[in-house]
Amino acid sequence: MPTINQLVRKGRHSKTTKSKSPALNYSYNSMKKEQVFNPAPQMRGVATRVGTMTPKKPNSALRKYARVRLSNLTEVTAYIPGEGHNLQEHSVVLIRGGRVKDLPGVRYHIVRGALDTAGVDGRKQARSKYGAKKG
């Protein structure tokens, strides 16, 4: 336990929390050719690779993912939610934060129904999460 004099001299430091989606915290200034701190809720990117991945130990599946080069020039791995998708290389996608617990290294989700990503066909419930139209 610090003495009062030590607290007067140094003070207490508050803990800094690390971002769970660091790629969304920076944008790219092409004039200065540097990344600028500018947090955003979503970000646009181009899919450089689309494939499947197997989840961690107790689960078994082929989870769909895309490697995306964002507009701030960072490359991230993003999960494609829902059943079936129309994504391929060079598709323009919208990325949001949110990890997939059983896929290591996947910290982002692709927003369905935005830009080149189509919504899920025949979806009746939770339609807004999958970009599905009514009817």
Curated annotation (Swiss-Prot):
Pfam families: Ribosom_S12_S23 (PF00164). GO terms for biological process: translation. GO terms for cellular component: small ribosomal subunit. The modification 3-methylthioaspartic acid is found at D102. Signal peptide: none annotated. One of its GO terms (molecular function) is tRNA binding. It comes from the Bacteria. Residues 1-24 are annotated as: Disordered. PROSITE patterns: RIBOSOMAL_S12. Residues 9-18 have a biased composition (Basic residues). With S4 and S5 plays an important role in translational accuracy. Interacts with and stabilizes bases of the 16S rRNA that are involved in tRNA selection in the A site and with the mRNA backbone. Located at the interface of the 30S and 50S subunits, it traverses the body of the 30S subunit contacting proteins on the other side and probably holding the rRNA structure together. The combined cluster of proteins S8, S12 and S17 appears to hold together the shoulder and platform of the 30S subunit. Belongs to the universal ribosomal protein uS12 family. Part of the 30S ribosomal subunit. Contacts proteins S8 and S17. May interact with IF1 in the 30S initiation complex. This is Small ribosomal subunit protein uS12. The gene is rpsL.
